[in-house]
Amino acid sequence: METSVSEIQVETKDEKGPVAASPQKERQERKTATLCFKRRKKANKTKPKAGSRTAEETKKHTPEAGGSGQRQPAGAWASIKGLVTHRKRSEPAKKQKPPEAEVQPEDGALPKKKAKSRLKFPCLRFSRGAKRSRHSKLTEDSGYVRVQGEADDLEIKAQTQPDDQAIQAGSTQGLQEGVLVRDGKKSQESHISNSVTSGENVIAIELELENKSSAIQMGTPELEKETKVITEKPSVQTQRASLLESSAAGSPRSVTSAAPPSPATTHQHSLEEPSNGIRESAPSGKDDRRKTAAEEKKSGETALGQAEEAAVGQADKRALSQAGEATAGHPEEATVIQAESQAKEGKLSQAEETTVAQAKETVLSQAKEGELSQAKKATVGQAEEATIDHTEKVTVDQAEETTVGQAEEATVGQAGEAILSQAKEATVVGQAEEATVDRAEEATVGQAEEATVGHTEKVTVDQAEEATVGQAEEATVGQAEEATVDWAEKPTVGQAEEATVGQAEEATVGHTEKVTVDQAEEATVGQAEEATVGHTEKVTVDHAEEATVGQAEEATVGQAEKVTVDHAEEATVGQAEEATVGQAEKVTVDHAEEATVGQAEEATVGQAEKVTVDQAEEPTVDQAEEAISSHAPDLKENGIDTEKPRSEESKRMEPIAIIITDTEISEFDVKKSKNVPKQFLISMENEQVGVFANDSDFEGRTSEQYETLLIETASSLVKNAIELSVEQLVNEMVSEDNQINTLFQ
């Protein structure tokens, strides 16, 4: 058998009726009968559709042409295009000749088989649709029509099957031309109705029975085919002649093995026999057409049956399965071998060479897809495992951090209790009071404030302050206060207020540990504070400060200031300012000043008040301003007579920004100040301003007096601002009235 070059064309033409007829008839009868019958009956109807019907006719004749000789892939393309044009001319000749050799009138060189004459009878329906435009075309390229029939067969298979199966089937179709031809006939008939216009790209598949390999070539549109048809006709004829000789020995075996033995072998022999005589019988195509016309009409009516459908279905399945098995293992080798053999013969054109390269790439890509799918699966599995491991690690780390944080909180609470007990025991000793007061206060207050600012401060400060103050203040108030205030308040309070509680506590602990810190307190304070300062302050301060800042600060500051004002102010004011700067500082400063002046500042009022006032002025002034601004309407009513109603003023009131600079009272000149209330000036004159000048530390002033001074100053500023705003409003109202009057005038 000659290797047939089949091309898959996507065309839209009306061959649905013949499609039903051809699959039912045998493949041989299908190719010839459907083509012939359609051409004759549908010649007038399907002239615009002749391209697709000619493709079907060529598909039917392809088994004959395939048996007679192989065509180059480029030749197949060109031949198909040429057939489309020649079919219109020579389709009637093909219809008559297919029983002998359908395509004889067009290309005498191309073998036209009598076996196709049988096929032409069922193909009469197809020929009806194709007669219009294909009769004239088929006369010139009957051999090419056969090639196209095989190409159409491959088209249907490629469309019905996945691309992979189509490629594999194409590789073994050289061995299975008989089966493929039958399958192609069915597929051609069924596929042409659903096919796309002939202008689309076509895939040409060359089948070589001798090499048992197939090359899938991607072809250009029919324009290239038409140009190449004329040049390739002689080469195709010579190829078919050579293939017929060689295929006589080797092809029958492959055909019988690939396709059902009885239909495939009989069809192949029938194709081989007429192929040699097609050239000779080309001139007698007209007589054959006339004879076959009557036969096709009769056979077209009776040949349609269910037997062909079953046979074709089985043949297609077998052909596809065998093609898949044959090409599954070595699709690339078959393609390469065929390409090389054709290149040696000089039959491949440039377009064909490119299509061979593309076919190789497609085969390689498909072969790689299986490997890639497995590699992807392995990679995905590994990625998932790594992700799961990473997620588990992160989860475990988070869980551990949470657990550690909770454990540290509990540890700090227990450590605070242990420290309190140790502090109480240590403070009982009279000689250790100086060092113990500083150490116990710092360790106890620092840890208690950090761990549980709300509850721990109440318990810890109450117990520690009661024990420490009771025993320590009587014995060592003078020494402890002097040493503590000089050594701790200035550096520690300054750092605590300016920086953060963490730095203040580190500095305080560093100094206290130098004196005499017990081993338990050292380990507990060092580890507990370092480990839990970040976590406990965030959690505890947020919750505890909001709920119990007022009560905790009152109790803590009130008792802590008795013994060590510096430590209480460091821990309390530092944390209070960080947690709730607005409310906590207000409460802390108020209570700190009251407790400091009332209980503990008898010995060190000068130094303590200097630091306290400097630190307390900022929050106190801000709070005073807020309080005064909230009571601004009352101030308006009491001290200011407004010329306009309040409703109008409130509507037009613009925001007033009051800025109070931080200045030490020693630098504050009451006489030069314009905004100081008169009452304050009178009181200052009575008390003699020299009191401030005599002592830079303001020992004669209490915190209450400083607070009242700040409040009065702020209130005076607010009053002045309100007066100015009222004046502006009045001026604006007057100007508006004047403008209105001018408009009326």
Curated annotation (Swiss-Prot):
Annotated keywords: Calmodulin-binding, Cell membrane, Cell projection, Endosome, Lipoprotein, Membrane, Palmitate, Phosphoprotein, Postsynaptic cell membrane, Repeat, Synapse
Region (Tethers NFATC2 to CRAC channels): 728-745
Essential to the intracellular anchoring function as annotated region, ranges: 1-164
Motif (AKAP CaM-binding): 74-94
Biased composition (Basic and acidic residues): 54-63, 90-100, 180-189, 222-231, 285-300, 535-546, 633-651
Subunit note: Binding protein for dimer of the RII-beta regulatory subunit of cAMP-dependent protein kinase (PKA) and also for the protein kinase C (PKC) and the phosphatase calcineurin (PP2B). Each enzyme is inhibited when bound to the anchoring protein. Also binds the beta2-adrenergic receptor. Part of a complex containing AKAP5, ADCY5, ADCY6 and PDE4C. Interacts with ADCY8, and enhances its phosphorylation at lipid rafts. Interacts with ORAI1 (isoform alpha) (via N-terminus) upon store depletion and in response to LTC4. Does not interact with ORAI2 and ORAI3 paralogs.
Protein name: A-kinase anchor protein 5
Organism listed in the record: Mus musculus
Species classification: Eukaryota, Metazoa, Chordata, Craniata, Vertebrata
